[in-house]
C-alpha cells in the first residue's frame, strides 16, 4: 500500500479546474520601443464568461490580447493562462483564435472541411485522422451551420461564412476559450446578427467567449461584460453599466449618447 498523499477524487479535480480562472493579469505593463503599450492592467476571465475588450484604434487592445494568450511576455506584472504563465502555456487545443484577417482569407485554396480538420492537429498531429476525429469535424461543421459548404473552397465563401469556418476549426479542437479579434470586419449586417447569435449559443454551451472590438455597437447588446481600454483599463464590469460610466468619454472622447445611438 502506498504511503503517499491521498489523491483528490476525479470530480473534485474537475470542479477545481472549472473554477480556475482562464486568464489572470495582475499589474501588467508592456511597452514597445517607439510606442506605448498597456500599463497596470489587472483583470480576470472566468470559465463561461462572454466578455469584450473595447477601445479606440491604437488603444492597446491587440497588445493586451497577445499578453493574455502568451504571445507577449509582460515587462512587469503577472500573466497566467489556464493557471500557467501565459508565455509558457503550450496546449493550443484549449484556445480557439479567430483573427480579423480570417474574414479576408480569400487566398486559401483549400476546402472548408480541410480548414476544420486543422483543429484536430493539436490532438493527433499531422497524420491521418481517425473515424472519431472526422465525426468531431462533421459535428463542428454542423454546429456552425456549415455542413452544406464542407467541400466548398474557402475562396468561394462570404466573409461571414469564412468566420464560421474558422470557429468550426476551434470547435474541432475542443477549445475552452474562443478569442475573436474584430470578427465582423467586412461582414454584411445580416450575417453579423447571425454570427453573434452563434456566439451566444456557443457560450450557452459552455465555451468562454472573448471579443476584441473597437465597434461599441457590435458588442453592447451581446457581451455580458466589457473591459474598456485605452492603454489602461478605464472600465471593467457589466455591459449594462458601461454606458452610464465616465469610461466612455475618457477612453473614446465621446459621450454616453454616442453609445446609445450606435445600438
Range-by-range predicted roles:
Residues 77-95:
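Conserved ABC transporter NBD signature motif
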Residues 178-182:
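Catalytic Walker B motif of ABC-type/P-loop ATPase nucleotide-binding domains
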Residues 213-214:
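H-loop/switch region of ABC-family ATPase nucleotide-binding domains
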Amino acid at each position: 500500500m502506498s504511503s503517499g498523499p491521498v489523491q483528490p477524487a476525479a470530480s473534485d479535480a474537475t470542479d477545481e479546474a472549472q473554477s480556475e480562472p482562464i486568464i489572470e493579469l495582475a499589474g501588467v505593463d508592456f511597452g514597445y520601443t517607439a510606442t506605448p503599450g498597456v500599463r497596470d492592467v489587472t483583470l480576470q476571465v472566468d470559465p463561461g464568461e462572454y466578455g469584450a475588450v473595447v477601445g479606440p484604434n491604437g488603444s492597446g487592445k491587440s497588445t493586451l490580447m497577445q499578453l493574455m494568450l502568451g504571445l507577449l511576455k509582460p515587462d512587469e506584472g503577472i500573466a497566467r493562462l489556464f493557471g500557467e504563465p501565459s508565455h509558457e502555456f503550450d496546449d493550443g487545443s484549449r484556445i480557439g483564435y479567430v483573427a480579423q484577417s480570417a474574414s479576408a482569407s480569400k487566398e486559401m485554396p483549400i476546402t472548408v472541411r480541410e480548414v476544420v480538420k486543422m483543429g484536430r492537429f493539436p490532438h493527433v498531429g499531422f497524420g491521418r485522422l481517425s473515424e472519431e476525429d472526422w465525426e468531431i469535424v462533421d459535428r463542428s461543421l454542423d454546429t456552425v451551420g456549415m455542413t452544406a459548404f464542407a467541400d466548398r473552397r474557402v475562396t468561394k465563401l462570404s466573409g461571414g461564412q469564412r468566420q464560421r469556418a474558422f470557429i468550426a476549426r476551434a470547435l474541432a479542437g475542443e477549445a475552452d476559450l474562443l478569442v475573436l479579434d474584430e470578427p465582423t470586419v467586412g461582414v454584411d449586417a445580416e450575417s453579423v446578427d447571425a454570427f453573434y447569435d452563434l456566439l451566444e449559443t456557443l457560450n450557452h454551451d459552455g465555451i468562454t467567449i472573448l471579443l476584441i472590438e473597437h465597434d461599441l455597437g457590435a458588442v453592447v447588446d451581446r457581451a455580458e461584460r466589457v473591459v474598456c481600454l485605452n492603454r489602461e483599463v478605464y472600465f471593467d464590469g457589466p455591459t449594462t453599466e458601461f454606458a452610464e460610466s465616465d469610461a466612455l468619454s475618457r477612453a473614446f472622447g465621446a459621450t454616453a449618447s454616442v453609445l446609445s445611438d450606435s445600438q
